[in-house]
A protein has these predicted regions:
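Short arginine-rich
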Residues: 63-76
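GIY-YIG nuclease catalytic motif and its immediate N-terminal context
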Residues: 1-60, 81-104
Length: 104
């Protein structure tokens, strides 16, 4: 069955992927086969996985989670699904804003 998965790398970063054989793929990551990102950050640990009916859905979930913040990924890993909607909103208050002057 197809899977979307999250690995925690030795440097504390996360890697998100999808595969049809989860056990084999985690072994490959730890052997340095495939993704260069994880090859340089071994060992890796599987911290989250979700099974999907087909690989297209697993790949779509992978792409979605890759776009998430670290905090949102960690909420998913913890199973804190109630926190996900709040973490989806970008906090623009920490960025300086520039407005066009009002036309008179």
């Amino acid at each position: 069955m197809p899977w979307m998965y999250i690995l925690r790398c030795a440097d504390g970063s996360y890697y998100v992927g999808s595969t049809i054989n989860l056990e084999r793929r985690v072994v490959e990551h730890n052997e340095g086969i495939g993704a260069q990102y994880t090859a340089r950050r071994r060992p890796v640990e599987l911290v989250y996985s979700a099974e999907f009916p087909d690989i297209r859905q697993a790949y779509a979930a992978e792409k979605q989670v890759q776009g998430w913040s670290r905090a949102k990924r960690e909420a998913l890993i913890r199973g804190d699904f109630d926190a996900l909607p709040g973490l989806a909103k970008k906090d623009f208050s920490k960025y300086p804003t520039k407005r066009k002057p009002d036309k008179e």
